[in-house]
Structure formats: C-alpha cells, structure tokens
Amino acid sequence: MSDKKKAFWFIALLSTLVIIPFLGETIFYSKGEPREAIVAYSMLESGNWILPLNYGTDIAYKPPFLYWSIAAISAIFGGVSEFSSRLPSAIAFLAMQFVFFGFVARYKNTKTAVITSLLLLTSFEVHRAAVACRLDMLCLLYTSDAA
C-alpha cells in the first residue's frame, strides 16, 4: 500500500474514532439541537417529508436536508435520539475531512495533508460543529467541497 493510502486510512480511522463514539454520550446541550431534532421527529410521526413542521404547527426556517438526514438515520436506528440527530453532522465532517485530505495531498504532498487534516480535526469550532445537531457542518461540507 502506498504512503498516501496509509496516511488516508490513518486520518480516516483517527477522525472516525474521535467523532463517532461520543455522539450520544451527552444530552442536547443547546436550544438549537432539540429544535432540529423535533422537526425530524415530526417528519417521522406525520409522514410529511415535503414541508418540515415543528410539532405540526410552525414551518421550519432552515433548508430541509438536515431534517431529512436526521429523519432517515433515525428511521434506521428506530427513533430520534441524540446519537441519530448528531450523526448527519458527523458524517458531513468525515466527508469534508476526506475531501480536504485528498485535495491537499494532490496539490501539495502527503505529509502536508496529514498535518493539515490533524489541524482540522483538532480545531475547536470545527469539532464542535461536527458533534452537534446543527446545519453548520452540512453547509460547511457543501461550500468547501464546491470549491
């Protein structure tokens, strides 16, 4: 296996081990997290996946992809929980990390890609967004990968 592939799998394994196992360890810690999860819960309960509503009354103000992601993952896991609500953000972070590593490795070198990927993984605000049930990481994934 080439050095680039070894480095990629190292970053992939480390990023996954740092992010995924701890998603459901804490309860929702802000007003925003349960607000997003409630919309996904309402989607599952009502079966209305077109117009996301908050407990059947208020129309959600954010783009629906986060709600769709939470609802789809929660349907697989058997219900909306802290883990299933935060998993879309974590998956978006991992996808962004992999694309970021590939981009830097392609245009610089593997050593620089490993260092910058580790810096991204340990960045406080990026890590916070990766383990929270918020739209931020999905938006960051799509805007950074579009460039």
Spans of model-derived segments:
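Membrane-integral, polyisoprenol-dependent glycosyltransferases
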Residues: 2-144
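Active-site Asp-x-Gly
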Residues: 147
